C-alpha cells in the first residue's frame, strides 16, 4: 500500500468514520479508465461536435458540446444521466455529480493559475472532480503530468478524455502524461494506494473546483489531500462561500480543515461579484 504517513488500519478507520456519518448511499467504486491505442489513432469526434472557447485570458480550448453528449448517453440508456436530465438536475447524490457542466469557479481557478503564474511545468497534478477537464488540460498545456478524476465513468469517457485528445497535439502524451479515474473519493484513496506505492508518486498540486458543496463528502476530500499530496505540495480549492440548498461552503470547509490540524489555509483570491467565490490554498503545517 501507499505509505501515507499513517498506518493502513488508521486509513481504514478514517473511511469507516466517514461511512458511519453519511446517509447510506451506494457510491460507485473507483476505477482507472484506460485510453486505448484505437482511441488515440482515430478522429475522436466530428468537427460539428466541439467548439473552440476562450476560457482563460488568451487560452483557447476545444470542448465537446455537452448537449450532444447528453443525447448520446440517453440513447445509450445511461440511467444516471437520463435520471438527472429527467429531473432537470445537475446533482443526484451517489448517481450523478454534475460532471457534464463547466462550473463557474473552474473559470476562476484557471484564470488564477495563469494570472499568478503558478508553476506547472514538470509538476504532478491531480484535477479532482475534473468534469470537462479544463483545469487539467490547462496544466497539461503548461508542461504538467495530470491525473483526471471525476465521479461518473460516463463523464470521463464521453467528455474528459475526448476533450484532452482534442487539445493535445502529440497524442502519445495522453498515455505518457495522463491517467483517468472515476468513482467515489474514499474508494479512490484505496485504489490509488494500490497503484502508486511511493511517496514520489504523490502530487505536487491538487486542483479542485466546486467540490465542497456537500458537507457529507468534505471529509473524503480532506483525506485525499492529506494522503496524496507531497509534503511540499499545494492544494487549490475553488468554490462558493455558500452553496444554497446543499449546505456546504468555504467557511464551513475551512472550519473542517482547521479542526483536523493538518493544513494551513490561506484565501488567495476572492470575488464579491454575484455569488461570493473564493480560492483557498492548503499547505501542510510545519
Would you name each region that the model predicts?
Residues 1-286:
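S-adenosylmethionine-dependent methyltransferases
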